[in-house]
Structure formats: C-alpha cells, structure tokens
Regions:
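N-terminal secretory signal peptides and thylakoid transit peptides that target proteins
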Residues: 1-19
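N-terminal cap/lid segment of alpha/beta-hydrolase-fold proteins
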Residues: 33-63
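Short beta-strand element of the alpha/beta-hydrolase
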Residues: 68-75
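Cap/lid segment of the alpha/beta-hydrolase catalytic domain
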Residues: 104-128, 251-253
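Alpha/beta-hydrolase active-site loop
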Residues: 120-143
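Primarily recognizes the serine-hydrolase "nucleophile elbow" in alpha/beta-hydrolase
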Residues: 136-198
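Short beta-strand/loop motif that positions the catalytic acidic residue
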Residues: 203, 209-211
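C-terminal catalytic histidine-bearing segment of alpha/beta-hydrolase fold enzymes
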Residues: 234-280
Length: 280
C-alpha cells in the first residue's frame, strides 16, 4: 500500500494535459507552441534495443563535426510528443547530443487515451522498466561516434523529472541532473516505499531542480525538504521555486499551464547548468 502512482485526481490536479472530453490530445494547441527547426542540426526517429524489445526514440545533434555531451531528456506521462521532440531539438541547437526514449510503447502509447486510462498505464509500469528504458537511451547515445561518453546529463519533466532523480541515484556515470517538477514522493508498483527521499544519498551528480510554487500536486514544502535532504550528502544542489507557476509550466503546447517568464528563465538556467558541468 506504500505505492504512490498518480491517481486520476492527481493527473487532473497537475493540469499537465491538453484534453478534449477528457481524452489526451497532444498537439491540439500546437499553434501556440515553440517550433524549433532542424537548421544546423541532425534529428531523427530511431529504435532502441531494450533486452528483447525495441522501443522508439528520438535524437538530435549539431550538424557540424565534433563530439558532443549527451543529454537524455525524459518525457512526462504524455510520452514522446511533438513538443518533447522539440525540446530535444532545442538541446541540439545548444550544442548537445540529446535523446528521448518513448517510455509507453509497450503499453500502446498515450495518444488519444482518456485521463483515467493514462493514470492507470503510468502506474502499471515498474521502476525497473522505466529505468531500463532510460539506461538503454543513455548507453546508445554514449556509443555514438559524435558523443562525449564521459559527459552525461539527464533531465526530465513531470514523471520524467522523478525518473531523473531515480536514474541519477542508480547511475554513477551521470554528470549532471536537471529534474523539472518531478514528484519527490512518487513510488512505483515494483518498488513500494522507494521515493526520491529514499535514494537521495546515492545521488552524487550536481542537481538543479526546477519547480512551480503553485504546483497543486507537489507541495513546495516537499520540494524544500527534498532539497535539504540532498544537500546532506551532495554539495552541488540548487532548487528554484517559481512563484505562481503551476505544474508543467514549461509545456508551451499547453496554454492553460504554460508560464512564459518562468519557462524562459528555467531553460536558461538548465542550459547554463549543463554548460558548466557537461562542456567543461
């Protein structure tokens, strides 16, 4: 009973989805979304091998020859949407080799699903599977000729933010981590009781946390408590709480939650943080 997956109520509290009649419809508000083209970068849809399974992924890197730090960008519970692919391209434009795995391929993807089903699917996936998919993306990226395998950044949004913390705890090769509004008390069906607090002492990489002070699903007190917990064993920790910013404030394809000023400041901080630790 210690499992704390997202319930339907929590999904709706997060306000992280564009919906019509309660059905997830990524892209309905793309007219307002940021569009990053592929000038100067190479972007593609790929497949990753995870054990005996293949899952889709998306990667992008600068077009010019060179070796680039790796950034694994973990999506939220909407999966590998067009907006998330755009974020991957933004990292490439900033001089990184970025990759994002589709975490919900085995479950039939999230597009067109109603919120109760979305919550059920995300809760049914174990920590081991989630982290295995992220590991596959990181290993694939690090093996490419244009990658700097000794510079691995990880970042993620919503559920991907929580996975950013868990992956960093289990992966000593992570150089820097940037969780965006990741639930610090989220646990998994195969790991009851194992939330971010439980693994905080194992996170050795520098961490920049980007959270909204008006997030109805993640109390500011929890964020501050987790920051304090991390700082007990990690000297390179910084958390930012944006006033009046709700959950998913970076989602420019969702005008009901997007907060331009907070999103732009957080993006600048994210890039500066990765530049400091990954481009050194």
């Amino acid at each position: 009973m210690a499992v704390n997956p997202l319930s339907r109520r929590e999904v709706m509290k997060f306000g992280a989805f564009t919906t019509v009649g309660g059905v997830l419809t990524p892209g309905i508000s793309l007219a307002q979304a940021i569009a990053t083209d592929t000038r100067g970068i190479l972007a593609r849809d790929i497949e990753l091998s995870v054990g005996d399974t293949k899952i889709p992924a998306y990667d992008a890197r600068p077009e010019r020859q060179g070796r680039y730090p790796v950034v694994v960008a973990i999506s939220g519970f909407t999966g590998l949407t067009e907006q998330h692919k755009d974020v991957v391209r933004r990292f490439a434009q900033a001089g990184y080799y970025a990759i994002a795995p589709e975490l919900f391929y085995r479950e039939g993807l999230m597009f067109g699903k109603a919120q109760p089903e979305l919550a059920k699917i995300s809760a049914s996936i174990g920590r081991k599977q989630y982290l295995g998919d992220v590991r596959a993306a990181a290993d694939f990226a690090k093996s490419q000729a244009w990658a700097r395998p000794d510079r691995l950044g990880v970042t993620g949004f919503c559920g991907g933010g929580a996975l950013t913390l868990h992956f960093s705890a289990e992966s000593p090769d992570v150089t820097a981590a940037v969780p965006w509004y990741g639930h610090v008390k989220r646990t998994y069906i195969d790991a009851p009781g194992v939330d971010a607090f439980a693994v905080a002492s194992r996170i050795k990489a520098p961490v920049l946390g980007l959270y909204g002070d008006a997030d109805q699903g993640i109390p500011s007190a929890d964020v501050k408590a987790f920051e304090a917990e991390l700082k007990k064993t990690n000297p390179s920790v910084e958390f930012v709480l944006y006033p009046e910013a709700p959950h998913a404030f970076f989602s420019d394809d969702r005008p009901q939650v997007y907060r331009k000023a907070a999103a732009e400041d957080a993006w600048k901080r994210c890039l500066a943080f990765f530049d400091r630790y990954l481009k050194a």
